[in-house]
Amino acid sequence: MRFLVSGGGTGGHIYPALAIARGLKNRYPGAEILYMGTSNGMEADIVPAEGFPFTGISASGLERKLSPRNLLALWQAVRGFCQAVEIIGRWRPEAVIGTGGYVCGPVVLAAVLKRIPTLIHEQNALPGVTNRILSRFASRVAITFADSLKYFPDQSKVRLTGLPVRPEILQADRKTGLQKLGIKEGRFFLLSFGGSRGARSINGAMLTVIKAFAGNPDVEILHATGKAGYQKFLDGCRAAGIELDKIGNVTVKEYIYNMQDALAAADLVVSRAGAATLAELTALGIPSILVPYPYASENHQEFNARALEKEGAALVILDRQLNGGLLSRTITELINDRARLQAMAAASRKMGKNRALEDIIDCIDELIRSKRRHF
């Protein structure tokens, strides 16, 4: 069996596509996967490194204002569509899967033209422009948040599957996580991070939080600054009189490589509101304080965060409102109100979709079986 997978532009589109590709390989032993993206996008480097064949087509994003660049983008879309039609005609996949990004436009439309079943997956609560358009033509739409449903005209083809979560996250457990981190059972463990590159606003607020809890025997803090903000954060600690090597209950790192252990052990998380992060938090039932990245396209991180807030799984502090005092008070209130924290954890767990990958593959399998019945 052959499958074509597409998604590009950002890791938020690429990694779900790769997860689905692996899921297809597991479900259909011997299946061949071809990944189609843009030759100059992140996917051109990431996908081959993950062991999947990659082919590039022409595609670029439209600007939201009138611009000469949009003429070039339209030309590239037409060219990319023709390239996709030729490649799909040659490859003849059983199904085509798109996870978003402008490259998916020509790929999915080419598959529709060739009468090949198509599934698109939307990671965010506010669907991207490409997926909103493609939903009119795709055979099936898989969504991560129930809040997304209202944005798709034909809701009969929409399935709430969730976002695939890394197996190591799903397999992690609290006791092992605490042991690996060297944290005593019974201590309140606060985990904070701002994504792989860190977040300046969260770093700034966490300085105040660390100062407030420095030396507290009942609270343990692990904060990841991101590479760019690491030295500045250490300098800020010194300027604030925080001696990290002496206070004993705070660990500061550039990046957390064993995130599965940190998440499994966490009682509370402070983070941005990217779809992958929220899928991991809800898979493990972790309550959170979310600070959406304010410059995400169409402000989609705030929509993601509000979806958790609405269900009682998270508190939301907007980036422009964030300061050390507010964050410190909010954390203290939650530490002192364990009933509320437990209710947030239960709400988070209820939102978790631990079978997301299996459910997405089931949708694809359903499309394949349906096509075979009709031909």
Swiss-Prot record:
It catalyses: di-trans,octa-cis-undecaprenyl diphospho-N-acetyl-alpha-D-muramoyl-L-alanyl-D-glutamyl-meso-2,6-diaminopimeloyl-D-alanyl-D-alanine + UDP-N-acetyl-alpha-D-glucosamine = di-trans,octa-cis-undecaprenyl diphospho-[N-acetyl-alpha-D-glucosaminyl-(1->4)]-N-acetyl-alpha-D-muramoyl-L-alanyl-D-glutamyl-meso-2,6-diaminopimeloyl-D-alanyl-D-alanine + UDP + H(+). Pathway: Cell wall biogenesis; peptidoglycan biosynthesis. One of its GO terms (cellular component) is plasma membrane. It is a peripheral membrane protein. Pfam families: Glyco_tran_28_C (PF04101), Glyco_transf_28 (PF03033). Keywords: Cell cycle, Cell division, Cell membrane, Cell shape, Cell wall biogenesis/degradation, Glycosyltransferase, Membrane, Peptidoglycan synthesis, Transferase. One of its GO terms (molecular function) is undecaprenyldiphospho-muramoylpentapeptide beta-N-acetylglucosaminyltransferase activity. SUPFAM superfamilies: UDP-Glycosyltransferase/glycogen phosphorylase. One of its GO terms (biological process) is peptidoglycan biosynthetic process. It is an enzyme of class 2 (transferase). UDP-N-acetyl-alpha-D-glucosamine binds at T10, G11, G12, N124, R166, S196, I256, Q301. Belongs to the glycosyltransferase 28 family. MurG subfamily. HAMAP family: MurG (MF_00033). Cell wall formation. Catalyzes the transfer of a GlcNAc subunit on undecaprenyl-pyrophosphoryl-MurNAc-pentapeptide (lipid intermediate I) to form undecaprenyl-pyrophosphoryl-MurNAc-(pentapeptide)GlcNAc (lipid intermediate II). NCBIfam families: murG. This is UDP-N-acetylglucosamine--N-acetylmuramyl-(pentapeptide) pyrophosphoryl-undecaprenol N-acetylglucosamine transferase. It comes from Pelotomaculum thermopropionicum (strain DSM 13744 / JCM 10971 / SI). The gene is murG.
